[in-house]
Amino acid sequence: MTVSELNEQAKSLLESHFPSIEVVGEISRFTRQPTSGHWYFTLKDEKASISCAMFKSTALRVKFIPKDGLKVIITGKVSIYSPTGNYQIIAASMKLAGEGELEAKFSALKQKLSDEGLFAEEYKKPLPKFPQKIAFLTSLSSAAYQDMLRVARDRFALVKIDAYSVFVQGENTASSVISALKTADKKDYDCIIIARGGGSKEDLWGFNDENLARAIFAAHTPVISAIGHEIDFSISDFVADHRSLTPTAAMMDLLPDVNTLLQDLSGADNFLINFINSCFKKCENALNVANLSLKTKSVDSKILKFENDLREGESKLENFIKFRLSNFENRLNLNTQILKSKAKFFEITKNLVSISKDGKIVKLKDLKSGDNFEISSQEISKQAKIL
């Protein structure tokens, strides 16, 4: 028997006896081949280690970036690399150790709150059609926050936005959001948006907190949960009055499009004109019918009756037209005044800047000579240094 034959037989034996196994261990010596995209690493515990390989097509399905020191669960088959005789695992899937425990906790809490009725539609508060004042509960240094501001300005610049900085990752997430939520709920907002961009299950775990869920349910203000991406679900999503797929989608779900509103007003004007023309046409037809009827019936009584009917119809039509015109005029004046005031506000504030150092917002007086920092406005960011 040759070495090659031995290795091939050993490979066949291992793969037939261990076609699918699940192994828990810590990643070390992780590398990604730049040309093939395959992953190679060692899985170890306190007493032993084994080489592992994961091919690119499989690695693309992993929802996190592996790194040395991570404890993971590998599913795959045991094999031998024939050219060298190295014993290894060909990984078919990888998940973080403890992920199954998190899923169990998530399912248990979801069932508990559902049984208590916290997810029931009857308790969901409707979102306002034309919100004038809303609150963001998010990280003010995040891309999600900037995206929400941009979409809000594009769709409905009349809305006033207050932002509350909260932790969106880590053990302080729930308490931070609860505190901000209770504060915002007392300030007469039309809606409160809890938002965070995408991340791993562990990154988003703070939004699966029972106390946070109960705080959202108890809020008097309508609450939108916009946590992660479309495939991410949190307990906050289920208990909130509305779940948006992403923070950007939350703005599109909540705010009307000003261009659509203007088109609706134009359509209403056309409807009113057509309605008035229709009324006049009906009156004209009625007069023609009356004229024919007068030829065969009492002239005096018919004239009197049609004069009364005509005056009554004229009065109703006049009152209706005045009502509709007054209604449209009031709506147009209101929107015009709001638009002017908000446009002035955005014009005044567009040149305001924020100062951040090492990713955190700081005060100008706290900077020292030699400090590097970033100056950011709504439109641009620049790096600077104190001389």
UniProtKB/Swiss-Prot annotation:
- Listed Pfam families: Exonuc_VII_L, tRNA_anti_2
- What are the GO cellular component annotations? cytoplasm; exodeoxyribonuclease VII complex
What domain of life does the native source organism fall in? Bacteria
Instruction: Tell me yes or no: is Lyase among this UniProt entry's keywords.
Output: no
The answer, when asked if Flavoprotein is one of the entry's keywords, is no
Subcellular localization, as worded in the UniProt entry: Cytoplasm
**Which EC main class describes this enzyme?**
hydrolase
Record EC number: 3.1.11.6
Tell me one GO biological process term: DNA catabolic process
Q: Which reaction(s) are listed as its catalytic activity?
A: Exonucleolytic cleavage in either 5'- to 3'- or 3'- to 5'-direction to yield nucleoside 5'-phosphates
Q: Enumerate the UniProt keywords alphabetically.
A: Cytoplasm, Exonuclease, Hydrolase, Nuclease
| Principal subcellular localization | cytoplasm
Record note on quaternary structure = Heterooligomer composed of large and small subunits.
For this chain, the family text in UniProt reads: Belongs to the XseA family.
The role this protein plays is: Bidirectionally degrades single-stranded DNA into large acid-insoluble oligonucleotides, which are then degraded further into small acid-soluble oligonucleotides.
Q: What is this protein called?
A: Exodeoxyribonuclease 7 large subunit
Native organism: Campylobacter hominis (strain ATCC BAA-381 / DSM 21671 / CCUG 45161 / LMG 19568 / NCTC 13146 / CH001A)
Q: Which gene encodes it?
A: xseA
